[in-house]
């Protein structure tokens, strides 16, 4: 799921849920005039963000573009902009961020495919097993 992140010092941050509680939902129009840092315009994540903003009825003021999602989080923590990132990057609470779900709970599904009729090495089979196990452990119980 994609999550809106804003600096904890932003006035809208007071609407965030307390730590340990499910995230509150934020209408992006509440921060429509704020600068944003988003993924590079050629990325899949940016395409999804552009669709989210279009559904919200505005185009964001993009202050920075990045190829690094963790970099987006760092820029938001520095209090100069807002961002949208996958939930994974917000799973550890931070006093510097306020995190919100978005209306409709947009998500980015990641899939891996491999031929079931072809040969898979022991290493490839082990990678599939470990990746599957890892992704199952990071799924949020409650966002």
What are these regions (language model features)?
Residues 44, 66, 88:
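Residue-level "edge-of-site" marker
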Residues 12-19:
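A short, charged helix-loop
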Residues 38, 59-68:
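Short beta-strand-to-loop elements that line the ligand-binding cleft
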Residues 19-27, 34-56, 120-128, 135-143:
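Secondary-structure junction motif
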Residues 7-11, 116-118:
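Short loop segments at secondary-structure junctions
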Residues 1, 23-26, 30, 70-119, ...:
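Beta-alpha-beta core module
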């Amino acid at each position: 799921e994609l999550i809106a992140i804003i600096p904890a010092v932003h006035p809208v941050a007071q609407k965030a849920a307390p730590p340990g509680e499910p995230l509150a939902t934020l209408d992006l129009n509440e921060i429509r005039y704020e600068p944003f840092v988003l993924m590079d315009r050629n990325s899949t994540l940016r395409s999804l963000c552009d669709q989210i903003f279009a559904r919200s009825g505005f185009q964001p003021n993009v202050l920075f573009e990045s190829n690094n999602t963790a970099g987006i989080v760092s820029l938001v923590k520095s209090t100069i902009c807002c961002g949208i990132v996958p939930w994974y990057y917000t799973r550890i609470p931070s006093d510097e961020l306020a995190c919100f779900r978005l209306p409709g709970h947009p998500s980015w599904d990641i899939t891996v495919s491999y031929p079931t009729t072809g040969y898979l090495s022991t290493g490839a089979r082990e990678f599939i097993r470990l990746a599957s196990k890892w992704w199952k452990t990071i799924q949020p119980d409650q966002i």
